[in-house]
Amino acid sequence: MTNNNAPRFLVIDGYTRAAREELQSGGASVAADLYVGMLERCGSAGTECDVIFPADPGASLPAGAAIRDYDGVAWTGCSSCVFSGEPDVAVQIEFVRECFRQGVPAFGSCWAAQIAIVAAGGEVALNPNGREMGIARGITLTDEGRAHPLYE
């Protein structure tokens, strides 16, 4: 945790380097940049954000940093699929498990939800209608989900 009143976040961008380059070549922003911008705009003065790209070979936390040093983790969406069998997927699932073990609050959407579910021992199923991007339909909350503070 930070020693001052300003929060320190770890932004984890799950896109592969090739996927990030493809986004940029098409004029889109890299997901991590969007998350950092939002956290800095909405956070208190002095909010700090570190970014890692765990799909990149050799990716690691900044020198001297540990997951427990962060006030929160924000995990971006990405174009990967939990079913791909790619080595970077397994690395990211294990990173989520470590975040869970450390007890650091985390937020994520889309891709982050898939790997968090798998990391926690749950199952993710292929959508029989194909991939959905940006909009998901027919999702219902369990009793546990409805009890989460987010929905109070």
Mark where each language-model region is.
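N-terminal beta1-alpha1 cap of cysteine-dependent amidohydrolase-like domains
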Residues: M1-E94, E98-Q102
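Pocket-forming structural segment of enzyme catalytic cores
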Residues: G14, G121-E152
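Short, conserved acidic/polar surface loops in the N-terminal third of protein domains
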Residues: S84-P87, V118-A120, P128
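Catalytic nucleophile loop
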Residues: F100-E123
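Short secondary-structure boundary/hinge segments and terminal tails
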Residues: S60, I117, G134-I135
